[in-house]
Amino acid sequence: MDLIQALAAELGKDPRHVENVVHLLDEGNTIPFIARYRKELHGAMDDTSLRTLEERLQYLRGLEERREAVKKSIDEQGKLTDELVAAIDSAKTLAEVEDLYRPYKQKRRTRATMSKEKGLEPLAALLFAQERDCLRPEEAARDFVDPEKGVETVEDALQGASDIIAEQISDDAAIRKSLRALISRQGQLVSRAATEDDSVYRLYYDFTQSVARLQGHQVLAINRGEKEGILKVSITLDREQALPLLRRAVVKPGSAAMEFVKSAAEDAYDRLIFPSLEREVRNQLTEQADEGAIGQFALNLKPLLMQPPVKGKVTMGLDPGYRMGCKVAVVDGTGKVLDTAVVYPTYGERQKNEAIAALATLIKKHGVEHIAIGNGTASRETEQMAVELIRQVNEGSAHVSYMIVSEAGASVYSASKLAAEEFPQYDVNLRSAVSIARRLQDPLAELVKIDPKAIGVGQYQHDMPQKQLDEALNGVVEDCVNAVGVDINTASPSLLQRVAGLNGTTAKNVVSYREENGAFTSRAQIKKVPKLGPKAFQQCAGFLRVPESRSVLDNTAVHPESYDAAKALLDLTGHTLADVKGGRLADLPDRVKAYGEDKAAGEIGVGVPTLRDIVSELLKPGRDVRDELPKPILRTDVLEMKDLKPGMVLTGTVRNVIDFGVFVDIGVHQDGLVHISQVSNKFIKHPSEVVSVGDVVKVVVLEVDEKKKRISLSMKQAK
């Protein structure tokens, strides 16, 4: 089965579409560009499917390279047979290839290699053959006693032969494959306490679970506990299940050497095979858990980045703190800093009242409409102060509301070189207040400045393979930025470098060109940016918006290569570009439908998927896909934990989705947990089947433990 067929079968896709995507990737096209502008070639796969395909393509190509390297190595030893070539070529995983290569690998000195050096290989071969007329092992071994070679006795000779046979059995690919499968089906992971002290790992102090039923979060927690020296972990398998399988594979009844080989097989299992497979299975469990956790991290990150912006509103950002006070920044509707301050609401009643007065003055002076409060240290006290402040100012003509904003990564950003370049005139602490305000206004534009790992919506992210995690999360950020589109005249270099086809250098060049020549007035002008060649322009053009352009198409996701098609469609349906600008296209979908989609697509020279995208963009030039998502919950009052009672029905925002449940912000300082058993009335394997980060959900309070600061919630009982 060739590469294309293998990918198509594995992913359940049309081989023609898979082949087209492979060609597009090999030509240097980006995933966002392929997903958006080459739908006809891949059957409208989404960006997630395309990234999975790209990942599997890299794996299978790596597998093919390893196959060739292994065959070459064995061939150089003069041991490559047609059967071995066929076995290597049909191996589906790297583990299978390595099993086949194992007998031919250069080995460190082992008991078997030392026995071979003593000339005991012929004895091992004689006994392992188990011919019916074979001599008894003790008799066969007499001829191999040679004190000069270190074989002093018959027992020494037999021990050496047994070591050689044991290693040969251990290197058998078919045996390893069968036993690996047996451990995966029947093996158990056992975790025991390595200390008597209490810890966060107490759940795993006396824990046994089938390998097949282990959850990813359990594996990652156990691994961390083991790494910290708190847990002792092992894989167990009933020896009496494994040995019969081994005996059937290597023991030939009726031979005088049968019992000797049986004993060597048991030694192979205990000393070589099981310890090796235990490590393999542990590694495989970790890889699967890492893969699942990275996937969940990516799944959680996307809705966080895609939170609807609160556009055009003057916003006050509060970065709470105790010793250093509460840092304050007021930004206008475009995110430009208007004012900054530091207040001390936690120092006492007098200072709190002074803080309220100072903030009320800022609200009145700048017409603040929203307050964004960071959720870190002293957030609770700051929120209570903000509610008092809002009550006071809203008694007049103001209509101020607030929202708790995740400040994950804000301190890292505020101390970064990027923040220093953006706000050289402001103290590090005030920069984080600006970032918090902007996170409410446009979460995506602000969060792209931060390493995705610092945004804090994953489990055990520091334990995962960082390269794999970075690739997955950067892919999510890239997909989100390109799905939304970027205003080329206001975007920061951090945002621009996430646009398909651009990088750090070309993003800075775009900003430099903008500063030297003024705002871009057309997409065509982008071609003048230094080091931004034709390929980069092709990839990025459709994702960059130019609101100042005289052509309305430059402020849509219609790619310049489809401008002629868009104009032809307007002609075909009796419309003009002026109608697009004036929002007079309400009947466009009906006119296209009446004309016939296939016929219209054929006449304007595009496929039906592209036709539909053009229609969608012409209807709403400059649209932001995030505006169609549930709006963030802005509050004017605060709930205390003591106010919560079982049975209360509340509305909240999903903050995190993990293997065992969902964390929901219900307006109390502590997020509540909806255990997986309380997420849905139907059986689900993972909460992400039902809910995503950022979703607004109804919940019922089940239990409140003020002492432990735990809130148990139910989604299914609220339905």
Language-model segments: what does each one mean?
Residues 181-188, 318-322, 376-378, 404-412, ...:
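A glycine-rich phosphate-binding loop feature that marks nucleotide/adenosyl-phosphate handling sites
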Residues 546-550, 554-719:
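Single-stranded RNA-binding regions, centering on S1/OB-family and related RNA-binding modules
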Residues 73, 87, 98-101, 225-238, ...:
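Structured, non-catalytic alpha/beta "coupling" segments that mediate domain-domain communication
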Residues 37-39, 128, 238, 320, ...:
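Short, ordered loop/turn segments at secondary-structure junctions
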Residues 1-19, 26:
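Generic start-of-chain signal for non-secretory N-termini
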Residues 49-52, 59, 63-317, 321-426, ...:
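Duplex nucleic acid-engaging cores and interfaces of nucleic-acid transaction enzymes
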Residues 3, 61-79, 89, 412, ...:
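Long, highly charged, low-complexity intrinsically disordered interaction regions
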